[in-house]
């Protein structure tokens, strides 16, 4: 692979002009102007994920992703104003971050700043809202992890790879009961600890100037106060010194083999080499592992 792609991955050189600014409340802004489109995209990344959960209260980061669409301080329904503005949105959570993004026509871009800043300021917390979203997430847990073949692979594999680090449980949570037992007070505490301008990065790209982006960010996000975000103290995962193996027998259509190796972090220059290598070996019908194990040539 190194002979094919070079001894080391070189950084990508681009003529894209990226603007950056940090506001007094700690919000970091990243901007790129693209006049070839009539749309503008806003993306907010909060520095919180499943790794920040208590081992006995897992699944909270993902649950909270759902709660963020349940209404905020001055906007009882998030989706309706966005749809009226011609926009669309989505979100996802992983072990490290929670990501929210939306796109709107450039003529309605201020609606996007208004919506995102208001739910960063404060959500509408209610027992009814929690019950609804808790039910949605529990059904997702059942559908993905309990009711289909191989659905619990993440729950089986992660504890093999990580013994003490919170990467040892999947984003959706270790157990269904953790989500079922989530209380409103716990949800509020999670919000005020992690959902803060000084724990977020706002990226804006599309047909909007840097000056207008700064103005709208200052107008809508500037009044959102800083919060006391806890210092992250994660346990250090000890080095793996021997092979770890687990065999599970199930009534499933086909056998499955899952293998994993510890590798460098994303900031390492070799990360992209390993990422490409993983795709070549095992991603898709043309991957090497599939071709070499197939009973007939393809």
Model-predicted segments: where are they?
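Charge-rich, well-structured scaffold segments of protease-associated domains
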Residues: 18, 22, 79-229, 236-238, ...
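N- or domain-start disorder-to-order transition segments that initiate the globular core
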Residues: 15-37
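Short, low-order "capping/linker" segments at domain edges
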Residues: 243-249
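M16/MPP (pitrilysin/insulinase) zinc-metallopeptidase core fold and M16-derived inactive scaffolds
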Residues: 41-103, 169-172, 283-294
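Short, low-complexity Ser/Thr-rich regulatory SLiMs
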Residues: 33-35, 93, 250
